[in-house]
Amino acid sequence: MAESVERLQQRVQELERELAQERSLQVPRSGDGGGGRVRIEKMSSEVVDSNPYSRLMALKRMGIVSDYEKIRTFAVAIVGVGGVGSVTAEMLTRCGIGKLLLFDYDKVELANMNRLFFQPHQAGLSKVQAAEHTLRNINPDVLFEVHNYNITTVENFQHFMDRISNGGLEEGKPVDLVLSCVDNFEARMTINTACNELGQTWMESGVSENAVSGHIQLIIPGESACFACAPPLVVAANIDEKSLKREGVCAASLPTTMGVVAGILVQNVLKFLLNFGTVSFYLGYNAMQDFFPTMSMKPNPQCDDRNCRKQQEEYKKKVAALPKQEVIQEKEEIIHEDNEWGIELVSEVSEEELKNSSGPVPDLPEGITVAYTIPKKQEDSVTEVTVEDSGESLEDLMAKMKNM
């Protein structure tokens, strides 16, 4: 009896996986993006419950982004749809990116459930198929292209190069950005090689093996250091990942750290594509101290990658060809130069009085101040009246009061 129940449970799980796989392979009907609504041709800022873009379009109204609708014209390739890559893909999908190209050779496992995005019923499906099915339901306006293979093999590398150079929103045009969300050195170097050869801008990301730190890095071939110039991560040497899995050893992973890294990666992507804020060339994250170091790295003139050295030479020529801009220092205009009467504006309260009336202000880093200070509690001043003892009794005092 117990064996038959176990067999039936296994059969149910197999059928659920097959059903999920069939659903992910279904071709959307005309006018239907595969989700629960029809495709929206134009983004709108109208504030109604049925508009999924109203909160995003508010960025334009508030002056953060000048043209948010432009996000639908971009195509982004994500290599690695794991703990960081899947969340990155979800965020970009919710933001309304034009097209996503997903690359991963792995399958969804129950061991992935400690991370974000994937669900237990998707176990056994390829990560790219499971991701496409979920993402299409979230936002049917986004175009998806998925590739279930390992980009590091010789036969797949050329196809990978072709898709990032011709798989843009308009076929034959390159993608606008490549995002590396892989977890091994070989795949990072493969992406680095392809992007250096094509002159393709990309962003690299990673989480440490102890799961409490991570980083993102913007790499513009020729302008900034490539992954071969200065690898930002120390990867364990002479370790075969497959043998580690066989021996029951694996790296730690926290959904919190991966979510933070995916968040700062997508934030950097949006700033880069939509041209707002400051784009970070390198941003680290240390969860133990809540520390976010930033820096930028110049390319190495002796880089081992010849295409990197070639891109550096082309970038130098490009900079040299730019017209030199003369910096004209404007003279500050003096307002009310004549002050015949020597009038000065003086505060009614001195700095010392203001300091004494305010509470203690903590030592804060540069650029941070308190919103307000709590005034010190003023002790009520009570005037003490001293009465001398006359030595008279209460009856004598009462008699004096009656005679008054």
From Swiss-Prot:
Q: What InterPro entries does this protein's entry cite?
A: D-isomer_DH_CS1, ThiF/MoeB/HesA, ThiF_NAD_FAD-bd, Ubiquitin-activating_enz
Q: Which Gene3D superfamilies match?
A: NAD(P)-binding Rossmann-like Domain (3.40.50.720)
GO molecular function annotation: ATP binding; protein homodimerization activity; UFM1 activating enzyme activity; zinc ion binding
Q: Which ranges does the record mark as transmembrane?
A: none
Give the residue ranges of motif UFM1-interacting sequence (UIS): 334-346
- Binding locations of ATP: G83, D104, K127, N150, N184
- Renumbered residue ranges of the record's region Linker: 347-377
User: So where does Zn(2+) get bound?
Assistant: C226, C229, C303, C308
Q: Which GO BP annotation is one of this protein's?
A: reticulophagy
Which of the residues bear the PTM Phosphoserine?
A: S45, S358, S393
The cellular location(s) given in this protein's UniProt record come to:
Cytoplasm; Nucleus; Endoplasmic reticulum membrane; Golgi apparatus
Which residues are named in the active-site annotation?
C250 (glycyl thioester intermediate)
What UniProt keywords are attached to this protein's entry?
A: ATP-binding, Cytoplasm, Endoplasmic reticulum, Golgi apparatus, Membrane, Metal-binding, Nucleotide-binding, Nucleus, Phosphoprotein, Ubl conjugation pathway, Zinc
Name the principal localization, coarsely classed: cytoplasm
Cellular component, GO, one term? Golgi apparatus
Positions occupied by motif UFC1-binding sequence (UFC): 389-404
The UniProt similarity line reads: Belongs to the ubiquitin-activating E1 family. UBA5 subfamily.
Oligomer status and interactors? Homodimer; homodimerization is required for UFM1 activation. Interacts (via UIS motif) with UFM1; binds UFM1 via a trans-binding mechanism in which UFM1 interacts with distinct sites in both subunits of the UBA5 homodimer. Interacts (via C-terminus) with UFC1. Interacts (via UIS motif) with GABARAPL2 and, with lower affinity, with GABARAP and GABARAPL1.
Sum up the protein's function in the record's words: E1-like enzyme which specifically catalyzes the first step in ufmylation. Activates UFM1 by first adenylating its C-terminal glycine residue with ATP, and thereafter linking this residue to the side chain of a cysteine residue in E1, yielding a UFM1-E1 thioester and free AMP. Activates UFM1 via a trans-binding mechanism, in which UFM1 interacts with distinct sites in both subunits of the UBA5 homodimer. Trans-binding also promotes stabilization of the UBA5 homodimer, and enhances ATP-binding. Transfer of UFM1 from UBA5 to the E2-like enzyme UFC1 also takes place using a trans mechanism.
Domain comment? The UFC1-binding sequence (UFC) motif mediates interaction with UFC1.
Q: Which PANTHER family match?
A: UBIQUITIN-ACTIVATING ENZYME E1, UBIQUITIN-LIKE MODIFIER-ACTIVATING ENZYME 5
Q: What is this protein called?
A: Ubiquitin-like modifier-activating enzyme 5
What species does this protein belong to?
Answer: Pongo abelii (Sumatran orangutan)
